[in-house]
Amino acid sequence: MSMLFYTLITAFLIGIQAEPHSESNVPAGHTIPQAHWTKLQHSLDTALRRARSAPAAAIAARVAGQTRNITVDPRLFKKRRLRSPRVLFSTQPPREAADTQDLDFEVGGAAPFNRTHRSKRSSSHPIFHRGEFSVCDSVSVWVGDKTTATDIKGKEVMVLGEVNINNSVFKQYFFETKCRDPNPVDSGCRGIDSKHWNSYCTTTHTFVKALTMDGKQAAWRFIRIDTACVCVLSRKAVRRA
């Protein structure tokens, strides 16, 4: 019985050694697999090829029924290209920033996984000097209940509210700025000559990197958030006598 077993093993090894290998199944830059490579090694090579052809933004984070169960590798937040001063992952709600001057401090100190290093502004520098007023009034808040957003392709996507990082639940916050009132004065924007100009305040947007759902995986996407309040002007038609 043992002799038959050894004979079968020998025949199996000879068959594997004689089997031809196709170079088309080998990733670029690698040599042809040796005869002693097993099917497991072959499957690993296939997985590597698929990973190299996949988009760089995809994250290997599986969904287990609910978004709060998604586990994310903290090393992903060390990539500089994924950082945004308006996106914050924190275990506790960030303090309410009175204006965008406080934005750097909030992002740099509240979340260890997406810190940004930017030049420090003087805390004693006032936003407006005496006698100066803003053309439009804006309000800035940290938004922590965003569930959907519009991506850079114009499609509506689901935003991850919470992720698990090192066995701690981090919530995803967005620092958004929008207009308090489209018409801060009766004529529109403040300080505009209403005799010659029509004016109104409107909220503008920008795109930031955020963790969103992509099928059954978490993925980085550019999503649109409110970031500023600006004055829109149009010249009034001149009436000719």
Swiss-Prot record:
A 1-acyl-sn-glycero-3-phospho-(1D-myo-inositol) binds at residues 173, 209. One of its GO terms (cellular component) is extracellular region. SUPFAM superfamilies: Cystine-knot cytokines. Disulfide bonds join 136-201, 179-229, 189-231. Nerve growth factor is important for the development and maintenance of the sympathetic and sensory nervous systems. Extracellular ligand for the NTRK1 and NGFR receptors, activates cellular signaling cascades to regulate neuronal proliferation, differentiation and survival. The immature NGF precursor (proNGF) functions as a ligand for the heterodimeric receptor formed by SORCS2 and NGFR, and activates cellular signaling cascades that lead to inactivation of RAC1 and/or RAC2, reorganization of the actin cytoskeleton and neuronal growth cone collapse. Belongs to the NGF-beta family. It is linked to Neuropathy, hereditary sensory and autonomic, 5: A form of hereditary sensory and autonomic neuropathy, a genetically and clinically heterogeneous group of disorders characterized by degeneration of dorsal root and autonomic ganglion cells, and by sensory and/or autonomic abnormalities. HSAN5 patients manifest loss of pain perception and impaired temperature sensitivity, ulcers, and in some cases self-mutilation. The autonomic involvement is variable. Homodimer. The homodimer interacts with a single NTRK1 chain. The homodimer interacts with a single NGFR chain. The NGF dimer interacts with a single SORCS2 chain (via extracellular domain). The NGF precursor (proNGF) binds to a receptor complex formed by SORT1 and NGFR, which leads to NGF endocytosis. Both mature NGF and the immature NGF precursor (proNGF) interact with SORCS2 and with the heterodimer formed by SORCS2 and NGFR (via extracellular domains). The NGF precursor (proNGF) has much higher affinity for SORCS2 than mature NGF. This is Beta-nerve growth factor. The gene is NGF.
